[in-house]
Amino acid sequence: MNDSEFHQLADQLMLNIEETLDDFDGDADIDYETNGGVMTLSFENGTKIVINRQEPLHQVWLATKTGGYHFNYRDGVWLCDRSDRAFYPLLSEAASAQAGEEVKFA
């Protein structure tokens, strides 16, 4: 993957997250802000989830209340480099725990 492909894939990932949060109709208040390739999700209880690009490594990193994860793009999916778990299920799990209700990203 070259830098241009990485940027396109990472941009699409961030856009999907934004669209999911814009369409979220649950009771939890989840705000997001994107600045310089870093997206921060802020929850009512004061916790945060941070998603950022690591361009030199062509990775996307996810930092949640319970841990940090590094994702590589393989076979059409962002997969954790340690567990091979996909990005969206991990993000959904973390966001649901931090929001106190189900939040589903896909």
UniProtKB/Swiss-Prot annotation:
Any one GO CC term of the record: cytosol
GO biological process: one example: iron-sulfur cluster assembly
Molecular function, one GO term: ferrous iron binding
Keywords for this protein: Iron, Metal-binding
Record bears the keyword Signal: no
Domain of life: Bacteria
Cysteine disulfide links: none
Family matches, as CDD domains: Frataxin (cd00503)
Pfam family, one: Frataxin_Cyay
Keyword Lipoprotein listed: no
Membrane-crossing segments per the record: none
NCBIfam families found in the cross-reference section: FeS_CyaY
Role noted for this protein: Involved in iron-sulfur (Fe-S) cluster assembly. May act as a regulator of Fe-S biogenesis.
Family: Belongs to the frataxin family.
Protein name: Iron-sulfur cluster assembly protein CyaY
Organism for this UniProt entry: Serratia proteamaculans (strain 568)
Designated gene of the protein: cyaY
